[in-house]
């Protein structure tokens, strides 16, 4: 047996907890890498890649893509890992620890580094690491999951950004309900009673939080309040029937650390990829829903907001959308109002289930290049020198 082939996974960092909230988008990126790994000889845990010391002393090829990384103290990976550094995002929250002398030496030795975003590219180049913008490996998901347009069905709304003003304010060290917002909530609830009641039944409106992670507030009114905030905004650009017929999904999942396995999380991620690949339309603020949709040529409306794209935003880590946002057709949301600089979207007054549009084509050149690089890397019959040509 020659060199082994591994699949990098990012199991939740539990630190003693029984349940951990996990962004399944990390596993969507693993699904993209898995297309090029046949067979998968073993999983390699990203957060513990420095501890990879196989008993057989054989190296393992590993496509290293994704978000790096929670446990920065475990960087860089073991010498037994032969890495392809591609579609990497280095979090500004971890950059100082990852880019120490040892970390920079690893990146230089195994570069050039394909960067998921332009922020990471600029960051690495400032540290003397050869880097280029590769975009995200999930753009290649059409390689396996693309279906004929005639077989498309269903609509998916996945973690769309919308504002949820706090109904509780703190005054004099005590918590009080905000009177004007409560009145507005009651007014809008009565105004949009039927669609709001229908939407509030969906698990999404219990679980969703625009700030990330899952909403742990289980107050009875919360799903109705979130449904009101969503519907009164999105009805302005999306037809009522589309909003009510769509399936709502959040990428945040609760993981039971005592029973969960990598196979289960990969299966969940793959089931989402298949949904997006088969949809008539996807509406999202999640890049690991939007980019797979581009890759499988599913029409996608990307909802952007200052909170989503800002270098200082709390929707995720700063810098993660540099170079990616331009691949989408975008609706910008500010407060409760939509705007767009996209000429095609500007011509659509309201999206319905019959609205037809095509995505931009800019993503395709990145998908083609990623496919070639990953296929070449995983080829057994090429020397290391040939693979780096």
Predicted regions and their residues:
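Active-site anion-handling motifs in enzyme catalytic cores
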Residues: 1-389
